[in-house]
Amino acid sequence: GIAAALFYLVHSTVTVTLLFLVVALVAAQRGEIGDVIQPAPALRDPVALGLLMLLAAASAIGIPPLPGFLGKLYLLEASLDRPGQGAVWLTLIAVGALTLIALARAGVTIFWHTHPKRITVWPAGDSRVLMQPVVALVVVVAAMTLWAEPLYRFTYAAAVQAADQTAYARVVLERVHFSAPWTRPYDGVLPQTEPPEVP
């Protein structure tokens, strides 16, 4: 279960960051309305922003074959035959459905319900500067989709290592032999210190 949770944590971090950056791009092209979900003048780059929004939303919802789907699939498999299986399944399905409804309604309002007036001056400056990190995150999402199995093996190894309490205790509590006085074991007596002399 920990391995699946770690995989989903990586996915959700990347996807939510991508979604926030895309929203920032959209808000920069909507004039004074910004990121408020209501009709506004048409966007300058509706096709590119629409595709980016669709990709981020699909990954957040968990549509295959994006990593959001794989992360939820791993969580569902990890919960099989365990206490609370029904709650896990219900939560994942409900969250996916609510996310789908919310993002679909927001997308319809932002991209279709537009004013005929177009914006010619962009108060937020050239929003295309934000495209560089957005493109980088799109590449990360694609890489997580193509190499999901190696990433899951990595998270599984991390989960196994975290669950190995013996090895963890050995590393943390292992005695390190130094001659420095502050590394000696505490014997219940506080060391006596003298205040520094003031010249």
Set out the residue ranges of the language-model regions.
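Functional transmembrane alpha-helices
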Residues: 1-118
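Cytoplasmic/organellar membrane-interface segments at the starts of transmembrane helices
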Residues: 29-51, 105-199
